[in-house]
């Protein structure tokens, strides 16, 4: 009891008062040290994100060789499942970016393990209604006016993805468990081992098991479970996790309220942005020549989704470092992380966007051999390059927000920026001004501009001493429970 009281007292000690960090304060070498730390975190994390992203891509590629019906149904099912399930699980699990990151910074190591189990339990509960939606996908797609044959095959594909959804509910908290301790090597090794298993497994299930396109869905489900089992084994057996491991106990139920307090706005923040881009693809189907418009916008979305792995990795690094430093009461260090992370974001934005702009005439050939599609994609390339710049900036700013626990602010910003500003502009330009797909993309990027500006304003006006105080008080309260 005495140890518990002393720990709580330590957490309640006032944070050292320092003035806000300026560029002149960064000449002491702390900025360079933090920049290197973020790079060593973000580089392997980007590889992890790409390896995870490639699981669906590999399944889609193999299913695509079975015919147009198989490809169309798998694409529709994957899009539906991403929107109604996987995006929601990812969003909910981002609560741990705040809770576990700050707990680790405050040296409440055991709390990290307990929070991970709490998240698994909560996400498993959420998967129950989501799986019912997936199980009835065929009926829902028919109500939405989809082709009956495509809806039937998509419904079967989604049903075989349901086991993978529950695996995802285990996998995402485990990923955050390692990420918040800056243990990226287990994530890197595991992701590539699973990817190397997934490729032959998917090939066998699609072409040699008699399952056909359903084999692609089963391969994703099995690979997700393998990923979760490998990470869980590392957590259980590795000495690197000895301080943060916690036994299963009734204590996991004590943190359910705290988890959902951050999980629900986290999910809203992630899903509102994710769904806005999916809505743009749906709107493109209402334009004249919908096949061309939808194909081109899908190529643009696929491009920015792939390139987003880099800012997503930087955001993960920034979120972890900021939450750790705030939990430790180091407000100045957290502020320096912001400078370093945004510097990396600007560098990424310039390199990636300029590369696409220079190679815009080759851009379309990667995705299509149709001349009309290639020319249209080349026309869209300057707009996509702007999108890549905005994604780099807002992605890292969103990571900073998660590290500080501003998910509710981020949710309001995304709601206003995309649904009250960007999408109305997109619809107006596309259908009233007749700019078609270009108008849709300009509109959604208008939303991204407003989102980036508002997130930057919130970050720039932050009192970092106050944020450190809030984090320490939150940890003291949690420790007291």
UniProtKB/Swiss-Prot annotation:
The keyword Transmembrane is annotated on this UniProt entry: yes
Membrane-spanning ranges: 38-58, 76-96, 117-137, 154-174, 187-207, 214-234, 267-287, 296-316, 336-356, 380-400, 415-435, 438-458
Domain of life, source organism: Eukaryota
GO biological process, one term: xenobiotic detoxification by transmembrane export across the plasma membrane
CDD domains xrefs: MATE_eukaryotic
Keywords (A to Z) from UniProt: Membrane, Transmembrane, Transmembrane helix, Transport
Keyword Membrane: yes
Subcellular location: Membrane
GO CC terms: chloroplast; membrane
Membrane-protein topology: Multi-pass membrane protein
Disulfide pattern: none
GO molecular function, one term: antiporter activity
Family the UniProt entry places it in: Belongs to the multi antimicrobial extrusion (MATE) (TC 2.A.66.1) family.
Name listed for the protein in its UniProt record: Protein DETOXIFICATION 12
